[in-house]
Amino acid sequence: MANILMPDCLVKLNNLLQAIENAPVECDGHTLMISSALNHAGISHQRMCGVVKNPKTYFELYPHFWIEIGEFTLDYRLRIWVELYSGGKLSEGAPHGIFDARGLEYLYTSGSICPPPALDFNLLNLISDGYYEKINFTELTTLAHSVDISLISDVK
């Protein structure tokens, strides 16, 4: 995920979140895991629910969940839905991971803040089939305290 416009702390965050990329949960469960982990580490963010659409391909997905940290979007599940509804060829162009959603063909719209319920670690681990415990919380908390995350965390 080389992107010179991406702050190093978000590149590191993306690397940490690779541990749960294959968790057997959809966008609601995946963002629930990420949001809970970010809350635990003290990283300011918003868990969002809304519509994602691509006017060029007539793709529209509702409801869809994603995370926002400042101007950046975290979405590890859109590509799955694009592939299911539009095919593998179109899914290759769908955003994935952490990215700046401004100017993309896929538009994140009608988003409303959807904070996660406070769930116990063991319950999150259970619903994710053991993936939640794969997050390195020590490194995540260290990351949160090693950079001025507030520079990118002024949520829209």
What are these regions (language model features)?
Residues 1-156:
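A structural boundary/capping signal
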